[in-house]
Amino acid sequence: MSFVIAQPEMIAAAAGELASIRSAINAANAAAAAQTTGVMSAAADEVSTAVAALFSSHAQAYQAASAQAAAFHAQVVRTLTVDAGAYASAEAANAGPNMLAAVNAPAQALLGRPLIGNGANGAPGTGQAGGDGGLLFGNGGNGGSGAPGQAGGAGGAAGFFGNGGNGGDGGAGANGGAGGTAGWFFGFGGNGGAGGIGVAGINGGLGGAGGDGGNAGFFGNGGNGGMGGAGAAGVNAVNPGLATPVTPAANGGNGLNLVGVPGTAGGGADGANGSAIGQAGGAGGDGGNASTSGGIGIAQTGGAGGAGGAGGDGAPGGNGGNGGSVEHTGATGSSASGGNGATGGNGGVGAPGGAGGNGGHVSGGSVNTAGAGGKGGNGGTGGAGGPGGHGGSVLSGPVGDSGNGGAGGDGGAGVSATDIAGTGGRGGNGGHGGLWIGNGGDGGAGGVGGVGGAGAAGAIGGHGGDGGSVNTPIGGSEAGDGGKGGLGGDGGGRGIFGQFGAGGAGGAGGVGGAGGAGGTGGGGGNGGAIFNAGTPGAAGTGGDGGVGGTGAAGGKGGAGGSGGVNGATGADGAKGLDGATGGKGNNGNPG
């Protein structure tokens, strides 16, 4: 069996020699062309002219054949040159790994680190640190992400030239890994890993801190600090609540529609008020819609929505009914006015008001006016005001005004109690303006907190026997605070001529849990037994209702990570949302 051996050096030398031969032949052909392709006739007779033309035609044919031969020659030279390069590249690729291993072996054996090459990346979910890059050239490996509760791995460091590896992201509730240091002479520091999100708990789990950015070397920029993890939501407080749900009061009926004739569509009926404890007010009925197809000068108005019913103690008010919409098709000189949304019902003690109804939309009229949103219902004692309704929109037509959003309801005053004054309810949000034109409604004012009540006086016993004792109602438990967002990682230091990395942004605070509400006071105690014909004892005074549980405050946003020495400080995390107001508790035990 024979083997073919290719020597790139010999092939390249042969290609060079062939190129030289081609150049010599081309030069000779060019010199002969001037002498042979245009032979002059020796005399003016026909024979001399024919002989000169014959020699000239032979010379021109030779030049054409020489040009084709030169093109083939050039193709052969190019093929040999390309083949020589391909063989040389293949030999270099085959020799490269062995050569790099031979160069790295002494440094690896002596220092445990190669001279040239990139560090290995940490495996995901292990928190493994990234490997360091080569001492001379190489980037650090990226750190592996952490499992739940496990910090992310640190990024590997570079050597003399190279970039530091990025830190791995922290698992749930754990910190992100730090970015690797850049090359000593030149390179960029690795970015810190992001902190893990908080784990839910009684006080809301803290989000993990973002990893610090890696420092730069002599030239280069430090890495950015990682973003802190978001805190987890706090656990809701225990709320005794009612034993069985109470059916809401009856809703109002919708208004009658108006078709093809001018006028106003029927208005919606008002919702019924809640009468029992915990019974929500009924929603108001929607106003009737109006429409016409064709006609001249027809003016129509949508029906107004019905008002929402007031809620019973501890129950929200009903939502106001929406205003009726008006749609004109093919009408000339018509006027379309949307119905106004109705006011939401007021909330019962400790409950929010109902939302205002939305204004009716209009379309197709020559002049269009959308309906206004209704005002939100006022909150009961300690309850939040209801949001205002959205203003109606003008969907089509040449001229029109969108409706204004309704004002939010006022928050209720705080509950007066023996120990803690109730927190005023939050005013409702104003409704949005119309799609094209219209102003949003103003938000309702927050309710005033109640003044702390004085301690209750002791009950007087009956003449015959002692009066019945008053049981102390149990208030709702306090909700846990939302988790604090994780701190952003510090920005990495810069090189002498580089820039510092910016600190990572703080994580968002967790959402606070909802507070429980206090129970209703117990019934009065029975009079004592009569001894020696004494006067019957008076019934004991019913116990005061328990203080409503305070809604949990939203968790504080995580502080922004510190920047480098001259870097920008990271932005603070967003504050968590306030906890929702607790519902009314169970009745207290009788005295």
Curated annotation (Swiss-Prot):
Ranges annotated as biased composition (Gly residues): 303-324, 336-363, 371-412, 477-491, 539-567, 579-591
Domain named PE: residues: 1-93
Subcellular localization(s) per the UniProt record: Host endoplasmic reticulum
Pfam families, per database record: PE, PGRS
Record keywords, A-Z: Host endoplasmic reticulum, Virulence
Record has tRNA processing as a keyword: no
Region (Disordered): 303-412, 468-491, 539-591
Domain of life where this protein originates: Bacteria
Region (PGRS): 94-591
Classification via InterPro entries: PE-PGRS_N, PGRS_rpt
One GO CC term, this protein: host cell endoplasmic reticulum
Chief place where the protein resides: host cell
Family label: Belongs to the mycobacterial PE family. PGRS subfamily.
Domain notes: The PGRS region is important for localization and function.
Assembly: Interacts with human TLR4.
Functional note: Involved in endoplasmic reticulum (ER) stress-mediated apoptosis through human Toll-like receptor 4 (TLR4) signaling pathway. Localizes to the host ER, leading to ER stress, disruption of intracellular Ca(2+) homeostasis and increase of nitric oxide (NO) and reactive oxygen species (ROS) levels. Stress response results in caspase-8 activation and apoptosis of macrophage cells. Apoptosis may lead to dissemination of the bacteria, thereby spreading the disease.
Stated name of the protein: PE-PGRS family protein PE_PGRS5
Annotated organism of origin: Mycobacterium tuberculosis (strain ATCC 25618 / H37Rv)
